[in-house]
Amino acid sequence: MQTFTSPIISTTFAILILVVATVRASVNASESQVEQDWITVALSEAHSMLLHVTLKGKNRKIHGQSVFDVYANPVVSADNTNIHYDAFSSFIQGDTKFTYMFVNGTSYMVESLASDNISSNWQALHCLPSIIPFEHIFPALNNATIVPSASVRGEPVDCPGGSLFQTSFSGVDFVLCVSSGSGFTAYGLDVTMTAKYLPGPTRYTLPALVEEAAPCPVVTTPEPVAPTAIAILTGRSLPPSSSRNLRTAAHAAIEADTCECMSTPRPCIFLHGLGNPNEEAELQDTPKLTKEKFGDIGDHAPCCTTVKYAVLNTVDIGWTNETLQQKFCDFSLSMSETSDLTSRTISDTIVVTHSMGGLVLASALATGKCKLAASTSWVSMSAPTMGSMAGDFLQDICDGELTDVVSKVMDLVGQCPVSIAKKSTYYQNGKYSTPELNAAYTAAQGAYRSNVHAALCSKSYNGVLSKYYPSCLVGGTVIPHKSKENDALVEFQSCLGGLDPDMFGDSYLDRFYSAKLNHADTAFLTHDGLFRDSQKPFKWFECLL
């Protein structure tokens, strides 16, 4: 179930972790005086940087842009022993400008009007929690090794007049070409970042938080960093003692890890969840008419001989509606010529459901409207098999309760009055549920356990950065979920449907995937994370069957 209608609010500094995080020079009595002097001078001459970022690979865009710039300014302590980098980047999409800042270890997003013709000073500042594994930054830089040559996706990395390094950050490999005095370039499978040293800092202004707001949390703190890291950040040559101790490795090759279909290729049908007001009699080739209730799986479906998307009204009709269940069955039966219309058996098909779509199919199976042959695989994401507290919460709001938080959550959970579909997802055995709804949940859970081939259930609303991220952050924290393990709308325990949680793992290679993704991420509306295996929904589907 999902109702995302908020403005676009997104970006990522995750690809910039090699340069825009806080660092502290490690100076202690055991170091030589020469090295101490070198560190002091190097930090005193630290440059501001222009970071030109190019995103590559599948589903790699921020606000629709795969190329953008980030500015990073060094902040050096008075004694030249401590340094951190502040950074910012701006994106314009539609009528809104989004500026992302990393200042004094704290992440912010500033939302403002993009048009100069609009006479308004409106802007809003949002705190962003840590979604970058900062604890791995410094080991990555400190452990960088010199390599004689390198390649990415089989293409050689050219580094004329510079030095090549290889390192790994949170399991992701990078090659760095460092040119003294001019900057460096970091190469990865999904990103290339060129850092150019600037003669002076770039100015920016951080808006003040509203008076009643709590201060934004610090998401990273200084940690020791070795001369190798300082040399990469500042463009200086290493001191002789560090140069002698620097390890050298063999050729560095970063190769793409792709998955091929491991089973019989079959047609795939995608059945969306709650919140789409549109209805189409025919299956669609794209999910455009689903009102962002499903994203495009694109070329992440090696086992799909064809891909179709159903477009059904899931605002005025809830998951217990027999007509809606019948449509789910009819569309699924139409995908393969081997399906048996007489026995209503869906054969040789991959059925993919998201959110309330999983409940619709489970209830259709439980009530005998259709059944799945052994040759059919049902893949479920974020199914609220016990309901969602979002429905109960919206009902509280519409009844006049919780008025102080209405503006924060209405874009996420929906509007008053509560829709029929939203009412159908009242939490099982909750104050708004009924005996009939409770019984329907129990029956659907049994069918779910007996038939689902693979499932993605999330333990965190802190997913990948996207336009849906801030609203999901609100949903995960403001909605009174019964568990902190939720994707903003659906709890992990609700998604389990009675399955053993020990079946689930946090790698995209696990058939039952315990992810850290928000509700939009699990609908393929965003993209894979760059670093964590627990944040790769597209890769999970690509490698699943």
Language model: regions and residue ranges:
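Active-site catalytic motif of lipid deacylating hydrolases and related acyltransferases
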Residues: 254-349, 400-402
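Gly/Ala-rich beta-loop-alpha elbow adjacent to hydrolase catalytic centers
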Residues: 352-357, 361
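N-terminal leader/targeting segments and the immediate start of mature chains
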Residues: 7-10, 16-86, 141, 150, ...
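Extended beta-strand-rich segments in extracellular/periplasmic secretory proteins, especially
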Residues: 108-229
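Helical cap/lid subdomain of alpha/beta-hydrolase-fold lipid enzymes
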Residues: 366-545
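Glycine-rich His-Gly loop
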Residues: 271-276, 354-355, 383
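An acidic-aromatic
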Residues: 69-136
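Extracellular/periplasmic catalytic domains that process cell-envelope and extracellular macromolecules
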Residues: 260-264, 342-345, 352-353, 370-373, ...
